[in-house]
Design a protein with these regions (language model features):
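Alpha-helical transmembrane segments and their immediate juxtamembrane cytosolic regions
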Residues: 1-371, 375-380, 388-391, 400-405
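Active-site anion-handling motifs in enzyme catalytic cores
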Residues: 397
Length: 405
């Protein structure tokens, strides 16, 4: 009898990541369908505004997952080696994207232009997220050190609130339109640090991982509906017909924090014993980076092909369900294939580096006669949790369940 070994991943976190993955494609539907150019009138505008805000949480959710899983990462070589698979994924998808542009879109640029787009991680159409992630990943050990130096829950709660206030609250307030003759917006709260909004979501993820707040699923769903309705209505009543004429909530708005938080809390603590389902969820969530980046090709293909079929709000929902399901299936299939092709390369590059780190750490810190057990999260030389996905496992879950099939 063959035995299946359950993945170390937290199933609930895999669900959050899968939701974020599929939200990427769903959000881009609104970008390419002409939604932002439509006149915001009627119930359809509010309904689709709620859908947009639901899917807009994809990037905040990814960052919160990073905070949740990397909360104990420390400054050491092993931490930075874990970034290599992400870089390889971006470069690989960049090459695929270049081939698509050359052979399918008939684009022609000098080789140096193509190369520059690769080494700046801009070639995959959505490579901006890789630029964000690299920067965040580089400073994670120092963020963790600062956060973990706070001794009490009260201090850490205050840190979360103040960070959100400094990096996001100002944007939300200053953006409120007044449409006055001399004053167009309120604009009285300093927003110089608004670019730090990713750190706000990262710290929220750390906080959830440490204190594991609980809220019933039906309350999460109800509060989520209320917040989505609030954002959609707020935009609707402040707009002058055009979407961008109103309050257009984005990632850096603090109003988005409770929405992302509610989605996270709805899924993150779900547990199941069905090992095949857990394995499937782990495999899907592991390809999130490739899935995100590859989706640009599908977006370009589908929305170019179906552009003439969009007829405003009258068929927006129908077009959503016509494009998004098949887009998800094809993008996921391509991601799993590319993932499998890149996995040996990632292991070939990272495995020797991890061994070198382990030897260096062992030489610098000889084991005591009666060693104290050290958790996986406290050991910079332990690369046992590193596969293709640098965030595929929790730091504390090392249990392996088996079932006969």
């Amino acid at each position: 009898m063959k035995k299946l070994i359950a993945p170390k991943n937290e199933f609930g976190i895999d669900l959050v990541k899968i939701f974020a993955m599929f939200s990427v494609l769903s959000l881009h539907f609104f970008l390419y369908s002409g939604f932002y150019e439509l006149e915001s009138h009627g119930l359809q505008a509010i309904i689709h505004g709620m859908m947009r805000m639901l899917f807009y949480q994809c990037v905040p959710l990814f960052i919160m997952i990073t905070g949740y899983l990397k909360r104990n990462a420390k400054f050491c070589a092993a931490h930075y080696i874990k970034l290599i698979p992400v870089l390889i994924s971006s470069l690989a998808v960049g090459l695929v994207t270049i081939c698509y542009k050359i052979f399918c879109l008939n684009q022609s640029f000098a080789p140096i232009v193509w190369l520059q787009s690769l080494w700046t991680f801009n070639q995959p159409g959505y490579g901006w997220y890789i630029n964000l992630y690299i920067s965040l990943f580089m400073i994670i050990p120092f963020i963790n050190g600062a956060y973990n130096s706070l001794k009490t829950k009260k201090q850490k709660t205050a840190a979360v609130i103040i960070f959100i206030f400094v990096s996001m609250f100002a944007v939300s307030i200053n953006r409120i339109p007044l449409h006055g003759e001399y004053i167009q917006s309120i604009g009285f709260i300093p927003n110089y640090l608004s670019g730090l909004w990713p750190l706000g979501y990262y710290i929220v993820g750390m906080y959830i991982a440490e204190f594991r707040p609980k809220i019933s699923k039906w309350r999460c769903a109800l509060l989520l509906f209320i917040m989505l309705l609030f954002e959609a209505v707020a935009n609707y009543v402040t707009t002058s017909g055009n979407f961008y004429g109103g309050i257009t909530f984005n990632n850096e708005d603090c109003v988005n924090v409770p929405i992302a938080l509610l989605i996270f809390l709805m899924f993150y603590d779900i547990q199941i014993k069905n090992i095949p389902i857990r394995i499937a969820a782990a495999k899907i969530s592991a390809v999130s980076v490739v899935f995100y980046l590859l989706s640009w090709i599908g977006d370009d293909y589908f929305y170019t092909k179906h552009r003439a079929e969009f007829k405003g709000f009258s068929n927006l929902t129908a077009m959503f369900f016509k494009i998004i399901p098949i887009h998800i299936i094809l993008c996921l299939t391509a991601s799993l294939i590319l993932f499998a092709l890149l996995k040996p390369l990632n292991k070939a590059i990272t495995a020797p580096l991890f061994k070198l780190c382990s030897r260096s750490a062992a030489a610098e810190n000889p084991a005591p006669v009666n060693p104290t057990p050290v958790s996986e999260t406290e050991s910079c030389s332990d690369a046992s949790d590193v596969g293709y996905d640098a965030e595929s496992k929790t730091d504390s879950d090392t249990q392996k369940d088996t079932v006969e099939v």
